[in-house]
């Protein structure tokens, strides 16, 4: 089983989870992660790096230059959106694997009589709340941060003295960064208006009372200036930390969550294990008419 990774930590988690679910279904021994995207990503994409090593999960990685070169060719071919039989033929010749895009993934997952021949190579984002939540007991243990990062978190003032010592904490994630600076990301996603966050805070406080707001953003200076005079607001500044999973862990430990149109804070909220949590998510995830499968029935969509 191959999983071709791309994107930031949130996207990598969706891709790994989908591959893991299918691996268990097919009873395959190994799950091989292809990280060649991070060495040769498209110019229009935001530069990312492999980050799944921040969790206690098991995987193999492509090791030979031959395999990496072959996958790199496949990635370039896949950008042209060729007919499935053409792409599958290329996969078969180069990798001796079956190409498995998202649409075919669900057919295979739901086929109880599926016969495994050459194995499969998953190639999509798999951003599907229903898929992940229907396998919650399987997926939740996978994305627990490793011991080294847990020790770092336990030493953070924002965790020890703010999140752990306040019963009513709400994480608030504002994604700016590449949604502003990268034309492709800006056109596809767009930045949520502040009105969304104001409505979300009002909703949670109407239900659960006054909250301590823990602000997370990839534009820390902007966040610090924006919330400088707000009582009970704390802006998390881990900008010099190279581990994205730390802020995600902190989000998950807040009582409630207000997420951005970002898979990163989606996972922060999903990993939250408070039974009476309130999660507020954007009703409109993408700019234009693109539809999302990331909404959860139990979350409040504004």
From Swiss-Prot:
Entry keywords, A to Z: Glycosyltransferase, Lipopolysaccharide biosynthesis, Transferase
Enzyme class label: transferase
EC number, as in UniProt: 2.4.1.308
Native species: Escherichia coli
GO function terms (MF aspect): galactoside 2-alpha-L-fucosyltransferase activity
Gene Ontology process terms (BP): fucosylation; O antigen biosynthetic process; protein glycosylation
One cellular component (GO) term of this entry: membrane
Reactions it catalyzes: beta-D-Gal-(1->3)-alpha-D-GalNAc-(1->3)-alpha-D-GalNAc-di-trans,octa-cis-undecaprenyl diphosphate + GDP-beta-L-fucose = alpha-L-Fuc-(1->2)-beta-D-Gal-(1->3)-alpha-D-GalNAc-(1->3)-alpha-D-GalNAc-di-trans,octa-cis-undecaprenyl diphosphate + GDP + H(+)
Family membership noted in the UniProt record: Belongs to the glycosyltransferase 11 family.
Protein name listed in UniProt: O-antigen biosynthesis glycosyltransferase WbnK
The protein's role, per its UniProt record: Involved in the assembly of the O-repeating unit during O-antigen biosynthesis.
